[in-house]
Amino acid sequence: TSERLLIEGTLPGADASELWRVLRPAGGVAVLGGEVKQVELKNWFVRGKVPGVKLEDGKKSWAIVRRGKLKGAGDWTHQYAGPDNTTNSRDDLVRGDMGILWWGEPGPKPMPDRGGRNPAPLAANGRLFMQGNRMFFGMDAYNGTILWSLSAPEIRRSNLPRDGSNMVASDDYLYLSDGRYCIGIDGQTGERKLRFSAPKGRDWSFMAVAGKQLLGSSVLPDSAYKADDEIGEWYDSG
């Protein structure tokens, strides 16, 4: 929103290019309104080369613009990037040296020990999904804001060299395997919205999202590696 436009009725800057530059990709929304002619508001966006602007006229002029995914941006939706396990995000934007985009929560405290070889974080549609020690975080990939956190004492996975991850992501959902069930978590809110059952006497195992399909295999109950906290994190005697 623009305080100057709302209170004074003057547009901020010569055009909307700066607004578009700082607006978060993959879901950022800007809403502007005030005592300004609609044609002036429209031309302000046109000069800034901002696409997809919706205008409404009433006692005040209003404009709303939503920014989509960056063209060429890649995702990391599975343990090894995609359902084909290529370890390639297919991102066409990252070049040269890398730096720190943001720094902060959730930090190391809620994370499990790295020695357990735990599931990798996932990235989809501008969000990051991180698995802590029996808890999960949904985060804004562009500024690090924690969108939601979810305590799940019953969900744990480790020893990934010998097992599959217990989570995959799509543009809209994070899918978690929880014993016999696969839970679909709303990527933006953290709400548990979907539940899929494995056949009786089986647990969910490997999962993948391909297009609009959720695929999975099943295993015997309680056969996944969970790194039990009470008996230690040993997997074999070798």
Features from the language model and the residues they span:
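Short loop/turn segments that connect beta-strands within beta-propeller blades
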Residues: A141-N143, D186-G190
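A short acidic, Gly/Pro-enriched loop at the edge of an enzyme's catalytic core
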Residues: T1-L5
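Repeat-blade elements of multi-bladed beta-propeller folds
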Residues: D113-F136, S158-I183, P199-S237
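Blade/loop signatures of beta-propeller domains
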Residues: G74-P106
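A short glycine-rich, Lys/Arg-flanked "PGG" loop and its adjoining helix->strand segment in the class I
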Residues: P12-G28
